[in-house]
Amino acid sequence: MLLMKLSVAIICKNEEKLIQRAIVSVQAADEIVILDTGSTDRTESVVAALNLPQVKFIKDSYVWKDDFADARNAAMDCCTGDWCLLLDADDFMAADSIPEIRAAIAAMPSARTIDCKILHEKSPDFYFYPKLIRLNAGVRMVGACHEVTSVRDAGPHAGTMILGYSENHQNDTGRVLRIMGQMYAADPTNSRTLYYLGREHYYRKDDAKAIPLLEACVKCSTFLAERADAYLYLARIFWRNQRGCDARAACMNALIINANFREALLFMATLSFEHNAVRWREFAAHATNERVLFVRNPP
């Protein structure tokens, strides 16, 4: 069996506190490429102190453009492996992920992307996302924020990535909103942009901006999981604005799209009188969450 070379591509800026954890979690990879986008802290010296021969730290060659896909593509272009694992400096891989990944890329010779299971460090939420990309197969990252692969192959997942949240992200609370706003200005009909920008305004309780964005998303999106999630966000917005009928209608639309959407079933219980709520909770207990975009309330 031909042994596939595995690269890891990390983009970073001012991650002196967390980048060691990220690197150590993938040190079994053949190559670790770190593209620095302008650090002014000790990130480089922390990396150098690890003294790992497979690590390549690249600085002063990339100008940050408020575009995560562009930076990830630049990092991938510096990799020499057959496959590339995309990792952020504040994230890390669970134990045994690299052996799982090696087995997967050997077993799926025709795949162009492979999903990883994505967990959150401080919550039980999870989802699956293509973090493994075959290099030189025409796959690129697209989207300045909440970027995605240009293609996505179906198949089993491999490895578990745990998302952290660095102080840099916490201190730059407007970054996502700023970049998503630029994406919306460039293409106001992109359903993915509408979804994520609407969700961002939902988090900020700016409902007057969130509602039209999410309503536009459910009208134009062809991705059913995205539409169902957008409907659920609309239901939550309507409910906190004392629009009970609209909330129930939006939540029901989410369930019409996917009757296995456990979070929507539980929220329908919240929206119902107790004698009906009992039934919704029973339905939720048997829901599989199949084809759900994000599993935020796992059993």
Role assignments for model-derived ranges:
Residues 10-28:
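Short, well-formed alpha-helical segments that are part of the catalytic scaffolds
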Residues 69-76, 93-212:
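Catalytic-site signature of metal-activated, phosphate-bearing donor transferases
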